[in-house]
Amino acid sequence: MQMTTPVDCAPALPGPLPRRHSRAAEIRWGERLVRVGGDAPVCVQSMTNTDTADAIGTAIQVKELARTGSELVRITVNTPEAAAAVPAIREQLDRMGIDVPLVGDFHYNGHKLLQDHPACAEALSKYRINPGNVGQGAKRDTQFAQMIETACRYGKPVRIGVNWGSLDQDLLARIMDENAQRAAPWDARAVMIEALITSAIESARKAEEIGLPGSQIILSCKVSAVQDLIAVYRELARRCDYALHLGLTEAGMGSKGIVASTAALSVLLQEGIGDTIRISLTPEPGAPREKEVIVAQEILQTMGLRNFTPMVIACPGCGRTTSTVFQELAARIQSYLREQMPVWKTQYPGVEDMNVAVMGCIVNGPGESKHANIGISLPGTGESPAAPVFVDGVKVKTLRGERIAEDFQVIVDEYVRTHYGAAQAKATAAE
C-alpha cells in the first residue's frame, strides 16, 4: 500500500468568503428595525399571494409568514382597492402584535397609487419599483421620479427590482445598438446581462439625483436560469456598493424550485454576495405559503451563515434500517422544534444553535449522536431493540418500548430548559 506524503500546511478552513461591503438600508415599522446590507446578517423575506384588497386574508397570511421567520413581507399593490386596504392590513397586524415591515410591490401604476393613497404610502415600510414597467418614453422618467419623491417624503427605502421578463425595452434597444458597433459583438446572453445591470444601476443613480440616499436603495436583477443569475450578480456586485436582494425568479414548483434556488443562491452567498434573499417557489395546491421562508432559512443555516431553528441530523436509511421508526421520529422532532421556536427564541436565547441527531443504526448512529447536542441511535435491522441517548457526547440513558418518541421529546425539552434557560437566567441576573 503506497503511503501518502505528509503535508506541512493545514487544510484550508471551511467557510464563505468575506461579505461584500455594501451600504446598509434600514427598514422600519414602529420599534422594529431590519437592516439590509452593511454588516447585518443576510435577511429572509417572503411575499403573500392573497388578494391585497382582502385585508383580513392578507393580514392572516402575513402573520403566518412572520411567525415562521420572515423578516420582511412583500404584498402586491396593484389596484386602488389594494392600496386602500394597506392601512387596514397594517392596523390589523399591529393589533395582533405582528410588527414585521411591509413592502409594497408596484408595477405600471405605482406612481398614481402612492399619490392617490397617502395612507398606503405611509403604512408601507419599503417600496419595490420595477424600472421596466414604470412607464414608457418621457413618462418613464416622470413617473419614476414621482415614486422616488414619495419615498423621500415618507423616509422609505426602495428596492429597484429589474426582471428579465419585464426589461425596459428602450434601454435594451440602446444596449443592442451599442453591441452592434463592437468589433466583436457579444452574444445575446451577455447583452441581456448587461441590460439588466445597466437598468438597475442607472435607475439607482437617478434615484440618488432625485434625493433618495444611496443607503436607502436596494438592487435586484432577477432571471430564471441559475448560471445567468450567478453571472448577473457577480458583475452587479463588482460595479456598485448598493445592498443586493437575491432571488431566482420563477424558480418553479416543488423540489425543482428548491434545488434551482439553492444552486444559484448558495454560490453567490459563498462568495459573500447578497444581503437579503427570497425564494420564489410555486406552491403546491393547498400547500402553506410559509415553505418559501423555511427554504430560505435552511439555505442560510446549512451554509453556516445564520441559525434560525435547531436542526435535526438524520441518516438517509439503507438496508440496515428497514424500520421506518427513525424516519418518523426525525420528522416528528424537526416539526416539534420548529413549532416551539416562536416561544423558545425569546425564552431560550441560543437554542437555534442546537443540533439533534436521529440515527437509524449502529454504523454511524452512536458517533453522530455524540457530536450533536442531543442524539439518539435507534436500532437497525437485527440489532438489539434499544436506543441509546447521548447528551453533549455522553450516553445518559437507553430508551426501549413503544414510547421512545415521547420519551426522547421529554429529554429534548429538559435539555432546552436546563441549558438555554440557565443562560437566560444568568444574563438577566447580570443586568
Curated annotation (Swiss-Prot):
Keyword Iron-sulfur: yes
One Pfam family this sequence matches: GcpE
EC numbers on record: 1.17.7.3
Organism: Ralstonia nicotianae (strain ATCC BAA-1114 / GMI1000) (Ralstonia solanacearum)
TM annotation in the entry: none
GO biological process: isopentenyl diphosphate biosynthetic process, methylerythritol 4-phosphate pathway; terpenoid biosynthetic process
Physiological role: Converts 2C-methyl-D-erythritol 2,4-cyclodiphosphate (ME-2,4cPP) into 1-hydroxy-2-methyl-2-(E)-butenyl 4-diphosphate.
Protein name: 4-hydroxy-3-methylbut-2-en-1-yl diphosphate synthase (flavodoxin)
Cofactors, names only: [4Fe-4S] cluster
UniProt GO molecular function: 4 iron, 4 sulfur cluster binding; 4-hydroxy-3-methylbut-2-en-1-yl diphosphate synthase activity (ferredoxin); 4-hydroxy-3-methylbut-2-enyl-diphosphate synthase activity (flavodoxin); iron ion binding
Stated family: Belongs to the IspG family.
Alphabetized HAMAP family for the sequence: IspG
UniProt keyword list: 4Fe-4S, Iron, Iron-sulfur, Isoprene biosynthesis, Metal-binding, Oxidoreductase
Positions contributing to [4Fe-4S] cluster binding: 315, 318, 361, 368
Bound cofactor: record note: Binds 1 [4Fe-4S] cluster.
Pathway: Isoprenoid biosynthesis; isopentenyl diphosphate biosynthesis via DXP pathway; isopentenyl diphosphate from 1-deoxy-D-xylulose 5-phosphate: step 5/6
Catalytic activity: (2E)-4-hydroxy-3-methylbut-2-enyl diphosphate + oxidized [flavodoxin] + H2O + 2 H(+) = 2-C-methyl-D-erythritol 2,4-cyclic diphosphate + reduced [flavodoxin]
